[in-house]
């Protein structure tokens, strides 16, 4: 127990040499600050000329024109845990976007899986004696970029691809050691204040459709 109460925060700051002043705080306007630091991405008549080149990235990089880049302001994150059909699900989503949204520009990442034990070594040994050996939990994360005007269409395509999964082919390991079908897949939607520019090479435009894993055979995840 303390013999006396600890000093207050202002008192401690004064002892450390910080100066304190009374008065209103100057809190900047968020919208004003955002407009001052935002990057102009609307390609209007006042933007850079179409024939003018501008450097991208560090010095020494190849100069690109603005026509080589596409602005995005909406991001979807597809997330799931212990989804055994991770690669097949993301391939299905990518194939659906290429086939059903060919007239709009969309970009997406490949399957990103992260695994972790989630139990200590001592607890893992104890559970092993009870004939239940929990394996690592694998997390699926896939990101899809589009423009806000195309967000409803992309959202519907994502929902359709997720609902089209076959229950007999997707299972997860629950806490009781049994396998259960249809792992829940979550879709999160984010909207940016400023648009993000991506090169056209990173979009799904005119990309070949991978039909290697579209059959009923087993896919390695």
Curated annotation (Swiss-Prot):
InterPro entries: Herpes_UL3 (IPR005035)
The record's account of how the chain is modified after translation: Phosphorylated.
Primary localization class, coarse: host cell
Keywords: Host nucleus, Phosphoprotein
Segments passing through the bilayer: none
Subcellular location: Host nucleus
Presence of keyword Phosphoprotein: yes
GO cellular component, one term: host cell nucleus
Family: Belongs to the alphaherpesvirinae HHV-1 UL3 family.
Protein name from the UniProt record: Nuclear phosphoprotein UL3 homolog
Species per Swiss-Prot/TrEMBL record: Varicella-zoster virus (strain Oka vaccine)
Species lineage: Viruses, Duplodnaviria, Heunggongvirae, Peploviricota, Herviviricetes
């Amino acid at each position: 127990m303390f013999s006396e109460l600890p000093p207050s925060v202002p008192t401690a700051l004064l002892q450390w040499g910080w100066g304190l002043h009374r008065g209103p705080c100057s809190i900047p306007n968020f919208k004003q600050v955002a407009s001052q630091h935002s990057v102009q991405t609307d390609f209007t008549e006042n933007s850079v000329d179409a024939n003018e080149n501008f450097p991208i990235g560090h010095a020494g990089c190849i100069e690109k024109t603005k026509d080589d880049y596409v602005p995005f302001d909406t991001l979807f994150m597809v997330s799931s845990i212990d989804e055994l059909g991770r690669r097949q699900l993301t391939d299905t989503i990518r194939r659906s976007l290429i086939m059903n949204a060919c007239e709009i520009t969309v970009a997406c990442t490949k399957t990103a899986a992260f695994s972790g034990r989630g139990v200590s070594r001592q607890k893992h040994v104890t559970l092993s004696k009870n004939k239940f050996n929990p394996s690592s939990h694998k997390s699926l994360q896939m990101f899809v970029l589009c423009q806000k005007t195309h967000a409803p269409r992309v959202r519907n395509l994502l929902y359709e691809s997720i609902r089209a999964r076959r229950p007999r082919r997707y299972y997860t390991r629950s806490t009781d050691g049994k396998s259960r079908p249809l792992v829940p897949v979550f879709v999160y939607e984010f909207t940016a204040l400023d648009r993000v520019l991506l090169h056209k090479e990173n979009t799904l435009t005119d990309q070949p459709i991978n039909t290697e894993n579209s059959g009923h055979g087993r896919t390695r995840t």
